[in-house]
UniProtKB/Swiss-Prot annotation:
Pathway: Protein modification; protein glycosylation. Residues 54-83, 139-149 are extracellular. The keyword Nucleotide-binding does not apply. GO terms for biological process: co-translational protein modification; protein N-linked glycosylation via asparagine. Belongs to the OSTC family. It comes from Mus musculus (Mouse). It is a multi-pass membrane protein. This is Oligosaccharyltransferase complex subunit OSTC. The keyword Transport does not apply. The chain crosses the membrane at residues 33-53, 84-104, 118-138.
């Protein structure tokens, strides 16, 4: 395998360059990277790529039995389609659940007082459970009759 790597360098000669990092480029802080990851997670789970390509409406409308138009936030019976508000609401729930797991992880630090640990555990569990059960409610709105035991 080493000979295969050596073959191109028998013909090519590597230049002797001394590259330096520009002085205005700095290592971002951990919280900056974390914020970028959370924002990108929110946008991707919200279906921003789908929204840009398909250009769905922000909310839909449905005609009731009296002939009046009623706004709806969920595109029912379509798993592979969504309104913009539906994607944002689902993305908020997924992000809240992920943040709940991160809060639960942060509650394991050894130097946290007992009251703060209890509050972090409570907030983490509330975020995770609320996002889970609201996602189930959203699935029932999206696919009526689904998950009915």
């Amino acid at each position: 395998m080493e000979t295969l790597y050596r073959v191109p360098f028998l013909v090519l000669e590597c230049p002797n360059l001394k590259l330096k990092k520009p002085p205005w480029v700095h290592m971002p802080s951990a919280m900056t990277v974390y914020a970028l990851v959370v924002v990108s997670y929110f946008l991707i789970t919200g279906g921003i790529i789908y929204d840009v390509i398909v250009e769905p409406p922000s909310v839909g409308s449905m005609t009731d039995e009296h002939g009046h138009q009623r706004p709806v936030a969920f595109l029912a019976y379509r798993v592979n389609g969504q309104y913009i508000m539906e994607g944002l609401a689902s993305s908020f729930l997924f992000t809240m659940g992920g943040l709940g797991f991160i809060i639960l992880d942060r509650s394991n630090a050894p130097n946290i007082p007992k009251l703060n640990r209890f509050l972090l555990l409570f907030i983490g569990f509330v975020c995770v459970l609320l996002s889970f059960f609201m996602a189930r409610v959203f699935m029932r709105m999206k696919l009526p009759g689904y998950l009915m035991g």
